[in-house]
Regions:
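N-terminal subdomain of nucleotide-sugar transferases
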Residues: 1-80, 380, 409-412
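Short hydrophobic beta-strand element within catalytic cores of glycosyltransferases
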Residues: 319-322, 332
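Aromatic "clamp/platform" in nucleotide-sugar-dependent glycosyltransferases that forms part
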Residues: 302
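Short alpha-helical donor nucleotide-sugar binding micro-motif in glycosyltransferases
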Residues: 104, 281-282, 289-294, 386
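Conserved acidic donor-binding segment of nucleotide-sugar-dependent glycosyltransferases
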Residues: 334-335, 339-346, 355-360
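Nucleotide-activated donor-binding/catalytic signature segment of Leloir-type glycosyltransferases, i.e.
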Residues: 266-285
């Protein structure tokens, strides 16, 4: 399908700008690490570079032998990091205020973009504030919501207080959906701007469907493959996935479940679903082939700020079953490209999945519509929105640097 004709998607009303900028992007995760934040910020960085901007990428060193990439308009600044508990393949950046003060004093950016709120992000905020640099941020992960899934619900309010303090010290916080903006505004977050997410419709394409891969999974051409992609962790609500799949099996025993991803819940899931395929971490074209070789995408998570896997599945030609919030609310049309159910209603989720068992023709028809919708999610327009947030923040910062308190940006 031709995906060249993009149409408007949900973003604030902003105008693109073509001024070349020096941008420092600070993130505690980046490819080859596999997660939604790493994937989307890497795509944004690529888009900004393609549009002629000069980028500094500030991140933790992923291993002790890693060398920073440097060229004329792109420079990595690699700092100290530690493995994250239970996720040793991921790094948490350590406080690096002094190093950033030194670097930004001699390589001063026009604007600092904080992607994550960890120790590195906080020290970058402090350094940028001390140097009187304009700072914008992203709200990308519902850490406050994760706490209840790890038996630490008492941490929810302190975490939210920290996140609010962090983001309210920046000139603008970008959020991926209007729903999240409303939720955060109601708890005291300020200057929020909707900048959605795009999807790579060349990487995620039904043309990557692989009969050989389906044969490896032990399914025939007409058998339904149900896919879930993401971290195998308790906050992803995977118990509901198992229930939904078992309900589908009761209707059609040939249904196959494939899980792409890894995490601490893998062993428990393998015990509960011995017939499922656990494909582990997949990247690039291999990941695209796994998406395209399935038929239906089940997404039971209730802790997403967006959920990049939803448009990736849709771009791959899969119908989606999801809770009606975040990316699914924004891009899935109920009954046309998938089925949406009320937020956190596990029984409704399982019933929707079971309803599609054996309905191969309907699922395929919704998958075709899903592909058409995904083709409207153009990354070029998203990068334009980010550019304009930068320029607006820079202009406002220049006018108001004498104020001690953070001013609110005018509506874009």
């Amino acid at each position: 399908m031709d995906c060249t004709a993009a149409v408007d998607i949900e973003v604030d009303n902003v105008l693109p700008t073509r001024r070349s900028l020096r941008v420092a992007v600070v993130t505690e995760t980046y490819p080859p690490e596999v997660n939604g934040v790493a994937a989307t910020i890497a795509r944004a960085v690529q888009g900004l570079r393609e549009r002629g901007h000069e980028l500094q990428l500030v991140r933790p060193r992923q291993d002790k032998h890693e060398a920073a990439t440097q060229d004329e308009r792109f420079a990595e600044v690699l700092l100290r990091g530690l493995p994250i508990p239970r996720y040793p393949q991921l790094k948490m950046g350590l406080p690096s205020k002094r190093a950033l003060l030194r670097h930004w004093s001699s390589h001063r950016p026009d604007v600092v973009h904080l992607v994550t709120e960890g120790p590195l992000g906080w020290s970058a905020l402090q350094a940028a504030t001390q140097l009187k640099l304009p700072v914008v941020s992203d709200f990308r992960t519902n850490f406050h919501a994760y706490s209840q899934h790890y038996g630490m619900a008492w941490l929810r309010n302190p975490i939210m207080s920290y996140l609010r303090k962090f983001h309210n010290r920046t000139l603008c916080t970008m959020v991926p959906t209007a729903g999240l903006r409303g939720e955060l505004m109601s708890t005291g977050f300020k200057s929020l701007r909707v900048v959605s997410r795009g999807v790579d419709t060349a990487m995620f394409d039904p043309a990557r469907r692989s009969p050989a891969l389906r044969q490896q999974w032990g399914v025939g051409p007409q058998d339904m493959v149900v896919l879930c992609v993401g971290r195998l962790a308790v906050e992803k609500n995977l118990g509901v996935l198992v229930q939904a799949f078992q309900g589908m099996q009761a209707v059609d025993p040939r249904v196959k479940l494939v899980l792409v991803g890894d995490g601490p819940e893998r062993s428990a899931l393998q015990q509960r679903c011995p017939s499922a395929v656990f494909a582990g971490l997949r990247r690039g074209e291999d990941l695209g082939a796994h998406y395209a070789s399935a038929d239906l995408f089940l997404f039971p998570s209730v802790t997403e700020t967006f959920g990049n896997v939803v448009p990736e599945a849709m771009a791959s030609g899969l119908a989606v079953v999801a809770f009606d919030y975040a990316a699914a609310h924004q891009v899935v049309r109920h009954g046309d490209s998938g089925l949406l159910v009320p937020f956190a209603d596990s029984a409704a989720f399982c019933a929707a999945a079971q309803r599609l068992a054996g309905q191969t023709a309907w699922v395929r028809a919704m998958g075709e519509q899903a592909r058409m919708k995904a083709c409207q999610m153009d990354w070029g327009r998203i990068v334009e929105q980010i550019e304009t947030v930068y320029v607006t923040a820079m202009s406002h910062h220049t006018v108001t640097t004498h104020h001690a308190l953070r001013p609110a940006l005018p509506l874009l």
